[in-house]
Swiss-Prot record:
Pathway info: Protein modification; protein ubiquitination
Name the UniProt record assigns to this protein: E3 ubiquitin-protein ligase LNX
GO-annotated molecular function: identical protein binding; PDZ domain binding; ubiquitin-protein transferase activity; zinc ion binding
Organism: Homo sapiens
Gene: LNX1
Region (Disordered) location: 178-214, 475-494
Zinc finger (RING-type): 41-79
Spans traversing the lipid bilayer: none
GO CC terms of this entry: cytoplasm; hippocampal mossy fiber to CA3 synapse; postsynapse
Region Interaction with MAGEB18, annotated ranges: 186-244
Amino acid sequence: MNQPESANDPEPLCAVCGQAHSLEENHFYSYPEEVDDDLICHICLQALLDPLDTPCGHTYCTLCLTNFLVEKDFCPMDRKPLVLQHCKKSSILVNKLLNKLLVTCPFREHCTQVLQRCDLEHHFQTSCKGASHYGLTKDRKRRSQDGCPDGCASLTATAPSPEVSAAATISLMTDEPGLDNPAYVSSAEDGQPAISPVDSGRSNRTRARPFERSTIRSRSFKKINRALSVLRRTKSGSAVANHADQGRENSENTTAPEVFPRLYHLIPDGEITSIKINRVDPSESLSIRLVGGSETPLVHIIIQHIYRDGVIARDGRLLPGDIILKVNGMDISNVPHNYAVRLLRQPCQVLWLTVMREQKFRSRNNGQAPDAYRPRDDSFHVILNKSSPEEQLGIKLVRKVDEPGVFIFNVLDGGVAYRHGQLEENDRVLAINGHDLRYGSPESAAHLIQASERRVHLVVSRQVRQRSPDIFQEAGWNSNGSWSPGPGERSNTPKPLHPTITCHEKVVNIQKDPGESLGMTVAGGASHREWDLPIYVISVEPGGVISRDGRIKTGDILLNVDGVELTEVSRSEAVALLKRTSSSIVLKALEVKEYEPQEDCSSPAALDSNHNMAPPSDWSPSWVMWLELPRCLYNCKDIVLRRNTAGSLGFCIVGGYEEYNGNKPFFIKSIVEGTPAYNDGRIRCGDILLAVNGRSTSGMIHACLARLLKELKGRITLTIVSWPGTFL
């Protein structure tokens, strides 16, 4: 009988506004005068609290807008596309106007005072008889802080509701503002992250006195516990996806295109993050394209494109350019392309991905994923000498979620650090040129390196490899929720071998009846889904003319039909030529054979390979197949860019001539949002840069091309060939 009564108990009074409301709601105030419409939030229809400005010119409460954008991706007023990271805190002037709004004391039976909104909390603590009557004075508040970290006069903590946004959860878990929006920087007055919508909605930014350090520390632990609770409830964003699915069911009769939540701001730049993807159908397509692999200068597996109707798009957290480091605990940070594809194609209802997003402001190096390590206390000194102040050291620096400091993510082949030979991946950088970085950031470390003239003095802590699996592997459960062998019961990830691809040209004369179909389906062609591809055979009909002949196979590239070249023609033109033939047809084709390395049939990799072999009807060309085509089949395009005001073209390149590895093409590894390359829209991750202003890049070393791109002014013409990534 007591439980229903306690469930109906009123919410505790808030020590900031004096009203009874839950932790997930904004403060309530009574305004004796009408508030100007420009100072009203058009989501809650109340005066603005902690206002955020959108790029389209509207202003909302931080808490209101954050919760709105969890399920939507547009501005509530004009429905223009909107993400939280593009919003900025309103100006100091707007905040001052809001703080000066007159409010009445809510305890009217004890106090009738009218005062400015920013003074109400101080009024409760010092001179309000009503606040003293209800226990909201300073002494009572201090005693109740352990029960209500946000200042509510309650002796019991209130758990956050499932509606708390995932963005708010991430904000509660860290005291470090994101790199994407410098406006979200916590101030000394706040004592907490400025981007935390729950806490910012629960406190006044202009309170007259700062918090005590012990109070801030206590609140931090409370925030972490609340954040973990919400993450368990939302199952890493699956609840959001379910809301989107329900919305689609309710809008089946509408003609508007489906819009999925844009939650990619939940993955921080420059940090290794694990996410959980749920699928009802274990074999449902991810609807993404992948490029990269250890056989290419890209090294990593990178998302090139995300289709709007797939699992990844519904999840909403990943972006093109994100690097996939692990798949269900299997390390793919340095494996061949097809090996990673096999792992990603393995059916599972729960897919764990460990990913990393490139930082917007970073040293332009590629990287590899660190393994699990056990730290040691010893350290050593490394002195690197640059040939010029502009030369890069050839290391990529990242932070870790579970450890403070700066870590080396990768040592780039051929760079200064690589030639020196002392630095290794996952080394912790303790200091640079005497500056302590034990609790520093990769950005500050990069700044110190760039500011060095010639000599860079690093203090580094070496760590030893720890033989331990991932958390979910150690627990003995696989991605389907069933028991799997422990680490001692099966071997570690084998080192995959690189496949070999050969091209063989052939001429085939086929006889058929005049009205008989050839029995094959072709794809590709000029402007084929934004990629200019050769015409290739995507399937052969069993029992048809081509199938009976047996010489033209799925995957063959058609070069010529009865003397007519098929290069640079559209698919419809190629189909018309194939249908025009009578009783005899001569096909010139390029047969592309891919030989996978022989593996032990009992190894996990071999089992995965056999399990995930796509049937012929589902065959699609892999990205590495396109790379092996002869140059005559390249459909190159010229892209003209102009530098922005910051002087950057906005893309990162890897590859080039190396003394020990020979000549390799230059690949586009990443593209920075808001730059000329990004705004042009035609450059993708995995594209090959063939020439700059007509000058071939073949045979260039990386430093030479980087210097050339940096020094060129005005119009810059890039000659690029773009191949579609492997579809999953």
